[in-house]
Amino acid sequence: MSAVLKSPADSAIADISLADWGRKEIRIAETEMPGLMAIREEFAAKQPLKGARITGSLHMTIQTAVLIETLKALGADVRWASCNIFSTQDHAAAAIAATGTPVFAIKGETLVDYWDYTHRIFDFGPKGSEGEGPNMILDDGGDATLLMHLGKRAEKDASVLAHPGSEEERILFAAIKAKLAEDSTWYSRKSAQIIGVTEETTTGVHRLKEMSAKGTLLFRAINVNDSVTKSKFDNLYGCRESLVDGIKRATDVMIAGKVAVVAGYGDVGKGSAQALRALSAQVWVTEIDPINALQAAMEGFKVVTMEWAADKADIFVTTTGNRDVITFEHMKAMKDQAIVCNIGHFDNEIQVAKLEEHCQWEEIKPQVDHVIFPDGKRIILLAKGRLVNLGCGTGHPSFVMSNSFANQTIAQIELFTHPEGYDVGKVYVLPKHLDEKVARLHLKKVGAMLTELSDEQAAYIGVPKQGPYKPDTYRY
């Protein structure tokens, strides 16, 4: 098959000959993703996404391939790009492109390519046609959503592109300027057709909520990240397995006996700290929130500041979703051969730009660099400060991603089939009964038996026998 297969014209992938390998791994992943497979079985005949044109911006992995094929099985037309320049699994991209689905994703693509690909996933039909652009966005980190909003603003006021704050913004702004020079109403036409967006991750949700608060959000939005079966599983249990996998694939370092600093003790930080401790590292945590700091202390982690820890620890992991968590000054103070990495969405948690400005770089292998300071000291930076688990590893296991992607699929169905239930410009979460449904779909795979309430028990605690079992305020 791979010897004669030609790369589709409406795609940008590394190597179509990898499609057969990708297809074999997709088949394995399907056996580990019961939620998505059950949704296919339940909804395929009904075709609830027939007529949906979904622009997908999410890591192009084997697990994402199962999501894409689930959306297609439910009737959707899909165009896809990765949301990170290092996270693509090229064999997964090839397998999906080989089926005729447009895919624009290459591991190690440039930022120029990245924003070109993100533009191309919005081109569904001829200019001016009813199906010119998408009517749904499935986003991870909010870049596809950002592109529509920023581009539409720039159509009316080019000054919004005048002062980029980073190299990535410079490239993004240049891409928007080039598109506007080619087609001055491209963004407004595309955005006008979009019903809504479903957002996968914490960083993207922050962006949505910020736009909603300002009254500038153009679409309806569902916050998939804060579904319990996403944040308490993907963010915690997924990171618990994929963080150390990425670090060890990149460095072959012994974790035991090392001092590891985890910046942030949210769900991602909790999973990361547990993983490092399980391999017998001494784990320290930095936190801004007194509640999270107290949680970390009660779990036996030493809570410190980055300033205090910088010259003492061996491994540093950022998990916060904030910027400048590890600064150039912190890294100047670190030990020789300290390992620095990030498992938050964007690379600005670590001041990588200042390392590029002031230090020499020596590539050890793809996504593993020695950063050499003027005094000769070296630190090891993984994935250039981007997601270490996807840049240096293969990301979260299939099973936990089935939880997340089942939520994404249900959210897409909800917004597409019931847009009248969601106000434009507002951000929603899926109702509790759908969260519980996603959990139910995964119990059999792990051999879990669910106890059923009697009528008397249900009446005693005041909940329906079939759920929902907890109020929305319950924290799990």
Swiss-Prot record:
Keywords from the UniProt entry:
Cytoplasm, Hydrolase, NAD, One-carbon metabolism
| A biological process term (GO) from this entry | one-carbon metabolic process
| Broad class of the protein's primary localization | cytoplasm
One GO cellular-component annotation of the UniProt record comes to: cytosol
Q: Which reaction does it catalyse?
A: S-adenosyl-L-homocysteine + H2O = L-homocysteine + adenosine
Residues the record lists as binding substrate: T61, D140, E200, K230, D234
* EC code: 3.13.2.1
Q: Where in the cell is it found?
A: Cytoplasm
- Which InterPro entries has this protein been placed in? Adenosylhomocyst_ase-like_sf, Adenosylhomocysteinase-like, Ado_hCys_hydrolase_NAD-bd, NAD(P)-bd_dom_sf, S-Ado-L-homoCys_hydrolase_CS
Pathway annotation from the record = Amino-acid biosynthesis; L-homocysteine biosynthesis; L-homocysteine from S-adenosyl-L-homocysteine: step 1/1
Q: Which Gene3D superfamilies match?
A: Adenosylhomocysteinase-like, NAD(P)-binding Rossmann-like Domain
What PROSITE patterns has UniProt attached to this entry? ADOHCYASE_1 (PS00738), ADOHCYASE_2 (PS00739)
Pfam families attached to this UniProt entry: AdoHcyase, AdoHcyase_NAD
**What is written in the cofactor note of this entry?**
Binds 1 NAD(+) per subunit.
User: Which cofactors does it use?
Assistant: NAD(+)
* Residues annotated for NAD(+) binding in this entry: 201-203, 235, 264-269, 287, 322, 343-345, 389
UniProt GO MF annotations: adenosylhomocysteinase activity
Q: What transmembrane ranges does the database entry give?
A: none
Similarity annotation: Belongs to the adenosylhomocysteinase family.
Q: What does this protein do?
A: May play a key role in the regulation of the intracellular concentration of adenosylhomocysteine.
By what name is this protein known? Adenosylhomocysteinase
Q: Which organism is it from?
A: Acidovorax sp. (strain JS42)
The encoding gene is ahcY
